[in-house]
């Protein structure tokens, strides 16, 4: 059964602008340690950050909490499997919160084109 659906879209140029002004603070606030390590080697760093930002915002919308009180950007890490499919890896705090809500699965789809990145998340319960 679907618990929630979230979608987020962000303009990559907006992220480029933010990175040009406040790269360190933005990267530290939005990206997990794992993502920060990969970010250092990315050629298109704005697109990489935009995808992670949009994915985390969409997750928070699907959960119905937004980013802030219940979860932070640091509670979510987006990693791609060997085929390139993006998946969420959760902090222990967030994992326990989802268990309490009976949420068993998070589905993530990311897409981008020249100017925008979009993320779509579905959270499922077992019921």
UniProtKB/Swiss-Prot annotation:
Q: Could you give one GO CC term from the UniProt record?
A: cytoplasm
> Needs which cofactor?
Mg(2+)
Q: What is its EC number?
A: 2.7.8.7
UniProt-annotated location(s): Cytoplasm
Alphabetized Pfam families for the sequence: ACPS
Q: Which family does it belong to?
A: Belongs to the P-Pant transferase superfamily. AcpS family.
- What is the name of this protein? Holo-[acyl-carrier-protein] synthase
Species this chain originates from: Ruthia magnifica subsp. Calyptogena magnifica
